[in-house]
């Protein structure tokens, strides 16, 4: 989101939005936030990790192991994966927080190529200033997304309160011999999870938090596939290792969409 501004009839009386299947706007994003309700679909394709600190920890889907490169956006701008995260699908719209009134205000990224005043795509308002069905659908989607995101934050708070998260880094040997590491993320500590008392495990099972945790752990196998996809065609046998990272070592901050950082060192 480079230029997100509030949506209003005064500003957007002639605004249309054409989205289609072009995702070039996400080509430089190597991770995006997820909601817990997406774990089953996203976890079948992307590694799911956790990024942020304290109350700002959020679930995150890893989309690439190279900095500023999304391995799932193809050269023609289409999405090369089966499941497209809701964070990506909601673009170019986003809720902005208006602190003074404690409200969420719908914003649109005017830098997006699909935003226009030439009637390409869907209009936001009709000639009388009423919301179009398209804009109503956008609002409904974002309201649902926000509710799911808030529930996901509660799940992450549970993991933090139980001290189940540990900083990790993934190391890759890419075709050509270069070494890459992905840092700034956390995973659930399996041993601490197994050590939880039956009452706590029962509570997590009742709220589907335990299922989400297992889906997260199972999704980590996709790191090797992401590395292979990032290495281009012909990449074979990409070795992958995980190491515990010291707290404060490449740690993530905030709750942005780009918490997992990739670095590259040639050897």
Where is each model-derived feature located?
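Short, basic/low-complexity N-terminal boundary segments at the transition from targeting/disordered tails
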Residues: 24-28, 66-77, 148-154
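Short linear motifs in intrinsically disordered
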Residues: 36-41, 84-86, 160-164
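A short, compositionally biased
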Residues: 42-45, 89-90, 164-168
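Aromatic- and glycine-enriched beta-alpha-beta binding-site module
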Residues: 51, 58-125
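Residue-level signal for pocket-adjacent positions within structured domains
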Residues: 57, 67-68, 188, 199
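A contiguous, surface-oriented mixed alpha/beta subdomain in the mid-to-C-terminal portion of proteins
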Residues: 95-267
């Amino acid at each position: 989101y480079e230029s997100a501004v509030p949506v209003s009839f005064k500003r957007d009386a002639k605004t249309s939005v054409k989205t289609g299947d072009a995702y070039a706007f996400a080509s430089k994003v190597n991770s995006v936030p997820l909601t817990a309700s997406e774990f089953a679909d996203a976890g079948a394709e992307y590694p799911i990790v956790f990024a942020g600190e304290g109350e700002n920890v959020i679930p995150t889907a890893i989309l690439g192991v190279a900095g500023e490169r999304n391995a799932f956006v193809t050269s023609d701008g289409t999405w090369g994966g089966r499941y497209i995260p809701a964070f990506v699908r909601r673009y170019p719209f986003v809720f902005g927080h208006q602190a003074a009134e404690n409200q969420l205000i719908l914003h649109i990224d005017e830098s997006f190529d699909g935003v226009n005043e030439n009637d390409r795509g869907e209009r936001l308002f009709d000639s009388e200033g009423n919301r179009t069905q398209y804009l109503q659908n956008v609002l409904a989607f974002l309201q649902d997304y926000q509710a799911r995101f808030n529930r996901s934050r509660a799940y992450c708070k549970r993991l933090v309160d139980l001290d189940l998260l540990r900083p990790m880094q993934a190391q890759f040997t890419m075709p050509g011999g270069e070494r890459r590491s992905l840092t700034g993320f956390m995973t659930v500590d399996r041993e601490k999870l197994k050590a939880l008392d039956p009452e706590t495990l029962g509570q997590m099972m009742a709220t589907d938090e335990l299922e989400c945790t297992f889906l997260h752990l199972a999704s980590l196998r996709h790191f090797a596939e992401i590395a292979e996809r990032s290495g281009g065609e012909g990449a074979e046998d990409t070795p992958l290792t995980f190491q515990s990272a010291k707290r404060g070592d490449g740690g993530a901050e905030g709750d942005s969409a780009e918490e997992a950082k990739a670095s590259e060192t040639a050897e």
